[in-house]
Amino acid sequence: MAFFIASSPHLRSKRSTADVMRWVLVCALPGLIAQTYFFGYGTLIQLLLAISVAVALEAGIMLLRKRSPISALRDYSAVVTAWLLAVAIPPLSPWWVVVIGLIFAIVIAKHLYGGLGQNPFNPAMIAYVVLLISFPVQMTSWMAPIKLTAEPSSLVDSFSLIFGGFDSDGLSLQQIRTGIDGITMATPLDAIKTSLKAGHTMSETLTQPQFSGFAGIGWEWVNIAYLLGGLILLKLRIIRWHIPVAMLAGLVFTALLAQLFAPGTTASPMIHLLSGATMLGAFFIATDPVSASTTDKGRLIYGFFIGAMVFLIRSWGGFPDGVAFAVLLANMCVPLIDYYTKPRTYGH
């Protein structure tokens, strides 16, 4: 009888990388549908553009590296990166924003470090931060939810604004954003920060039109949709519970702590949970298996750190949302976290 010697791991998962990535995309669909419903067709256009650019860049880089582009494209990692970036930027951003972002994500943040499985930082978040710092106007030009607009942009107008800068009536995005009387175009998180800095109380801030019962109109349902998709990922065991639970716990804990010592000067935990990219970050971004911590205890520390940093950046930082910065800061700490949380060998 012949015996074969093989290296570990000897217990293998039945799911391939492509299977995992496909499930991530499927579970992100509820959030995409909610974003499209509340913020218009621009989200879908950005997504299709992002996927096309990401696939082209991935194939081009693999050819330059003299490797098969087909095998790289079959793992869907480039599509996931494109998806995360597309839903993170304003729906009516100029087309070149997502192109520049994906060049940084695919070429620099991913392949410069060796490709899939070698990148120390989340590629989509690297791209987002580069875009936010380089093009702050374009990256903060969010439209009000469709519910608050008299004439939402049609599919044709959205396409024209993204690729031409003007709609069918010859109006630019800036003209459209300033043409809605009484509605500020800031996101709920930005509106809260601006209002509190102006000396208003939290209760006064929440009387603005873009707020509803729990958080910002549209944003609360987008976060609930991503939460639903995240719970499906947990149910299917595509992701582990440690990072999302720890991140949300860190966000809630710091928000409660701030309200205890400075009541009325910071947003409530519910607003933080249902605003910005909280649920997208907790279930789809922070759980990136390549750039996240690899031990159970490390994942808890990693997730809690992200949640706490999100609150600190949202409350006192220079940007309205802090998910991308928090994730990248946590990525930097992963080697240290893993070093001090690695399981000890039995007997040592």
From Swiss-Prot:
Compartments it resides in: Cell inner membrane
The annotated topology with respect to the bilayer is:
Multi-pass membrane protein
Q: Which residues carry this modification: FMN phosphoryl threonine?
A: T187
One GO-annotated biological process of the protein: transmembrane transport
| Job description of the protein | Part of a membrane-bound complex that couples electron transfer with translocation of ions across the membrane.
* Similarity comment: family membership: Belongs to the NqrB/RnfD family.
The UniProt record lists the keyword Transmembrane: yes
Q: Which gene encodes it?
A: rnfD
Keywords of this protein's UniProt record, alphabetized? Answer: Cell inner membrane, Cell membrane, Electron transport, Flavoprotein, FMN, Membrane, Phosphoprotein, Translocase, Transmembrane, Transmembrane helix, Transport
- Provenance organism: Vibrio cholerae serotype O1 (strain ATCC 39541 / Classical Ogawa 395 / O395)
Question: Which stretches of this protein does UniProt put in the Cytoplasmic compartment?
Answer: 1-22, 65-71, 118-125, 235-242, 287-299, 342-348
Supply the HAMAP family for this chain: RsxD_RnfD
Q: Which parts of the chain does the record assign to the membrane side Periplasmic?
A: 92-94, 147-213, 264-265
The broad enzyme category this protein falls into is translocase
Q: Does the keyword Lipid biosynthesis apply?
A: no
* TM region positions: 23-43, 44-64, 72-91, 95-117, 126-146, 214-234, 243-263, 266-286, 300-320, 321-341
**What cellular component GO annotations does this protein have?**
plasma membrane
EC identifiers of the protein: 7.-.-.-
Describe the protein's quaternary organization and the partners it interacts with: The complex is composed of six subunits: RnfA, RnfB, RnfC, RnfD, RnfE and RnfG.
Cofactor(s) listed in the protein's UniProt record: FMN
What is the recorded name of this protein? Ion-translocating oxidoreductase complex subunit D
Q: What is the lineage of its organism?
A: Bacteria, Pseudomonadati, Pseudomonadota, Gammaproteobacteria, Vibrionales
